[in-house]
Amino acid sequence: MKIGLFGGTFDPIHIGHMILMENVINNLDLDKIYVLPNSNPPHKLENKKTALNLRLKMVNETIKDNPKLEINDYDYRDNEIHYTFDTINYFKKTYPNDEFFFIMGEDSFLDIEKWKNYKEILKENLIIFKRYSNKNFSLISKINQVRKYNKNIYLIDNIALDISSTLIRNLVKENKSIRYLVNDEVINIIKEEKLYVWFF
């Protein structure tokens, strides 16, 4: 099978994540995407995060009706820090008959030299989603450089609106509507658990 790996804190998961994953599945004909909620992402160790069980609940409620999306517990099962290089290797060794594609944003790709074992990551199947920003020239230039020794880099337009988890948290904090930005089940969880009122 062709399987995408999409990690994130998903705090909360939102319609932008869903549109992106659907777009990736359609463009690369993936059989499945493993959604990988992070317990301790190495680039966000100092950031406040909603409790993992609540983030998982929001992800599950959002993706449960899509058979091509599946939560995988690798990045949170042991509460350890998992680097991308280790994550990709784990799936390749555990499922040797499957082909894996790591999904990342343009900002992450442009800063990939800061990642552990980044040269090895650049040899893998990478799906990069771009935003409509002033970074597009730098992004295309970098992709062309990497493609000299790895042809398996795919650039996908992010057709979703400019939605982020930060935007949603700020709207909640300001007591503004997030309807249509997340699904109704996520809205209910946020209200019931009084999430994001403490973000600053």
Language-model regions, residue ranges each:
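Nucleotidyltransferase catalytic core that binds NTPs
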Residues: 1-200
